Amino acid sequence: MEDGCPRIRRRVSVRKRNRGNLENLRASPTPAELQPAEDTEDEAAAGSRRRKTGSPEHAQENDSEEDMFGDYDSFTESSFLAHVDDLEQRYMQLPECGDRDADSGTKDLCSAGLKNNLRVTTVINLTDPETSEHGQKQSHLDVPAEPEPGSDLSFDVPSSQILYFENPQNSPEALGDPCTKKTNGDPQKSSHEELVSSHTEQPEPNNDFSNVRAASESSRRKSLKDHLKSTMAGNARAQTPAFPRSKHLREALLSEEISVAKKAIESPSDDLGPFYSLPSKVRDLYVQLKGIKKLYDWQHTCLTLRSVQERKNLIYSLPTSGGKTLVAEILMLQELLCRQKDVLMILPYVAIVQEKISSLSSFGIELGFFVEEYAGSKGRFPPIKRREKKSLYIATIEKAHSLVNALIETSRLSTLGLVVVDELHMIGEGSRGAILEMTLAKVLYTSKTTQIIGMSATLNNVEDLQAFLKAEYYTSQFRPVELKEFLKVNDTIYEVDSQAADGMTFSRLLSYKYSEALKKMDPDRLVALVTEVIPNYSCLVFCPSKKNCENVAEMLCKFLSKDYLNHREKEKCEVIKSLRNIGNGKVCPVLKRTVPFGIAYHHSGLTSEERKLLEEAYSTGVLCLLTCTSTLAAGVNLPARRVILRAPYVANTFLKRNQYKQMVGRAGRAGIDTAGESILLLQEKDKQQVLELISGPLETCCSHLVEEFTKGIQALFLSLIGLKIAASLGDIYQFMSGTFFGVQQKILLKEKSLWEITVDALEHLTEKGLLQKDSCGDNEGLECHFRITKLGQASFKGAIDLAYCDTLYRDLKKGLEGLVLESLLHLIYLTTPYDLAAQSEPDWMVYFKQFGQLSPTEQNVAALLGVSESFIGKKAAGQAVRKKVDKNVVNRLYLSFVLYSLLKETNVWSVSEKFNLPRGYIQNLLMGAASFSSCVLHFCEELEEFWVYKALLVELTKKLTYCVKAELIPLMEVTGVLEGRAKQLYNAGYRSIMHLANANPEVLVKTIDHLSRRQARQIVSSAKMLLHEKAEALQGEAEELLRLPADLPGLGGPSSERAGSHAGDVTLS
């Protein structure tokens, strides 16, 4: 530096220190340290802390309040503190002091960077004794070996992962962890190590004066030092906890990019920033986690539409597999990150909700937003109001409706910036469509700032939907893989050709040689069609019924060559083994015969664990063919090279064009296949009807709001009055005019007008005691007001079907007279769904046998319900019964027996055999009971007379939701972890959410059988998200408790500022 220039005083960052373990290994101070120059005083004070800490082998966990001072440079710049610290350094050089502490270990300074909210030390205590000795090694392992895409995050390692790192190539040194490298023999030393070595090479000074001074004043200085440190520790606690520097840098960079994206998205310019107004990190995450490097042209066009930039409502439609979901995800991320608003995504089925939760949790962890599940019995009403981060709610149709109601009731709907609806065409499908219509109508009516995006592959009357949603429309015929449609009549295959006179042209004849026996067993020539593609390519065979799926799978295996058994034989054996583990030693006999050939069936008769396992095996190519029902086409994405429709029927109903398009849309896998094929098998008698099917327009989407009376228009009116959206007849009529039904009223209404239907529905609700009519004004029609009764409030809060609300009230009221709590049977009966009971038909012999095995107390429950053993015995014997018994009560009690047995045994297979019911049906019954139990709980919360049920139903709902041993429940809270997987994780040492949140996906893959990398990453991400949600909720509750009450007496007076300030100080301390 040239003379005359100002000298730069460099601030030296200070490592965290732990005085008790460093004394014996400190290097002696240099002469420069004893006689500091004027311009190096700060460096000398800081230099006394930069000492060599010893080798990592002796590292041990030492937590003290001194760790808080590591990042506070200002503490070291005080000359007085530096002097005190220097005196202490000299005192520690005394021989007796060194001897006394000669055996002390040192703390690994690198491990300070691992001190996040999730600590490894809590995991070590839960490990087996023989593995705990490796616990200290794990604190250094935060870099996974051979990072896969999406696995580049830092994970703390729980005890169950020790076996992975005992392998030499997986050791900390092999992984390249800088915290475990030794300085000796290392040609590339870190800057810190070089600095330490430069001090240790200096000659030792004379310490006579410091020794005498330290010996005489050690006690006084120690007391003074402790007092100062105690005071500073108290001040430090009020600060934000220190995080690793790398995390701060990442968050700062992300925050800066989000700020730039906010300005870009609000700017009228067409320049959208790095990635459609989003940080470049979003683009990187799509590459890492999903392998998406570039968007399709139509996706870019859609995202840059002027209507999208102006946040207008949008409907877009493309063929299946066209990439619709990616556009919706980018729009959701814009809302969450750039506009800082919550988002609601509505999906049709629970399985799809869970799949989407798993895939988006990694984005939430990296980008700083919550992903919350609202499906089945999961979901909190009203949702937690987050302090800083925003929430992405992923919900089924029913849960989305309850969520919107809760947001309207708490005046928080304005926080919802975007609603995304997948499979928008479902608005025209029965009661679920009516609920979806009500949800969207309420959002449109009560919030002018919430944007709605709807997408579907099968839409016809888009104009009606546009009018309802006030939306723009975008469509494209893009498919990443070309689809060729064929028809098979006898042995001839025709290609669908819209230009041909009869809609099809000749393609080819089947050349497969059939024996006479094979022709009888396989009249549709399925063996010939599937052997053209399997086992090298995948194939889906859609069948009319569940039983037909199983029969076709077995038939194919009988006539396939034995060579198919050798294809990926080892992996298929592993699938059988996994099925056996899921079934507690039992495997479906059909699957046991078909899986070795690479074939399986897929329908609702499987348990969710079995379905998930078979879907994963199919996706990875272990299974090459699935025989399935039409529900697979609308469920999870399982594409195939060839799709075969066994018949143009679903059960006994002829196929609709919407259903046909969804099924054939599964043909062709983007990035894998160059083309996709669909073949519809038909007989001559159905030929004309099939030609109309493939060439005709899609079915019109119509409102079911009035057709579904109790679940539709009545439930809508009750909630409108309960939420105070509308109170008078005129307001309700105005609301109805803006619904999808209001848009289509000219088409749908033949006999009554919309006004007459509105009046009739309100009168019916009043007669049932759900509404009460107030005095009317001069204009008795429009100005007639209504208010909701307590029963009505409970019904709409609990989302109870109004056809059963009065029955539920009577059952709960009767239960109070003699509730049997010695067992769960009585409570289970009260929470067994009414609609499932109406559809069931008991096996009377099984019913009689199970009744006889009840204890006297449990039989007393049946007696209270009016069902006697003699009645069931007569029904089992086929005798006539003169005594009239309510059929619904009898059926409901039978289903209660099934649920009661399941809760006691927690084994679907044994209960399935006991009651002669499909295991999939039993699991669906369990899920329905858990959901209805949650509804009954909310119903009881609104009625004081049912206070006794509240605590009882909370526990029952939890038991029905998980139906496993208590120790597995914490693991099953993680999305995507079902009973079989939870058992594997528990046995491997993962006992809590904290374990999973800190897990290394690579170690999970090696530790847990049949777990893919993708699944491992999703489990870890979902666990992290759940843990963050819980931590955020607890922090919010704590802040709420410490917040100064707004209605505190005296706040309005002249001395309120002083009083408020004083009260705030007390609260925060």
Curated annotation (Swiss-Prot):
Q: Which InterPro entries match?
A: DEAD/DEAH_box_helicase_dom, Hel308_SKI2-like, Helicase_ATP-bd, Helicase_C-like, HTH_61, P-loop_NTPase, POLQ-like_helical, WH_DNA-bd_sf
| This protein's record includes keyword Nucleotide-binding | yes
UniProt source species: Mus musculus (Mouse)
Know the name of this protein? Helicase POLQ-like
Protein keywords: ATP-binding, Chromosome, DNA damage, DNA repair, DNA-binding, Helicase, Hydrolase, Isomerase, Nucleotide-binding, Nucleus
- Record family assignment: Belongs to the helicase family. SKI2 subfamily.
**An example Gene Ontology biological process:** DNA double-strand break processing involved in repair via single-strand annealing
Whether DNA repair counts among this entry's keywords is yes
| Description of the deletion phenotype | Mice display Fanconi anemia-like phenotypes, characterized by subfertility, germ cell attrition, interstrand cross-links (ICLs) sensitivity and cancer susceptibility.
Which stretches are tagged as biased composition: Polar residues? 157-172, 197-210
Give residue ranges for domain Helicase ATP-binding: 305-477
What Pfam family is a match, any one? POLQ_helical
